[in-house]
From Swiss-Prot:
GO molecular function: small ribosomal subunit rRNA binding; structural constituent of ribosome
Domain of life of the organism encoding this protein: Bacteria
Entry keywords, A to Z: Ribonucleoprotein, Ribosomal protein, RNA-binding, rRNA-binding
One of the record's GO cellular component terms: small ribosomal subunit
Entry similarity comment: Belongs to the bacterial ribosomal protein bS20 family.
Biased composition (Basic residues): 7-20
One GO term of the biological process aspect: translation
Name recorded for this polypeptide: Small ribosomal subunit protein bS20
Amino acid sequence: MANIKSAIKRAKTSEKRRAHNASMKSAMRTAIKKFEALVELKDVEKAREAFIIASKKLDKAASKGLIHKNAASRQKSRLAKKLNSIQAS
């Protein structure tokens, strides 16, 4: 444990940020899993809504620095591909 006052504060702040970031990442992953579950069921309307939510969460995570912007873009592209595949069939 840190002894210097500023180091103690940094440790507390860092722990709060870590918990918040973990929560945001978890919500992002959950949104993606919900979308993928709807794709499996071939429910186009609900999948479209879930895609919008997942896209927003990915963009938010990228803007906050939780994931790289290219990683977010790549994941959104893959999700869009899945959505288009069920819309076509």
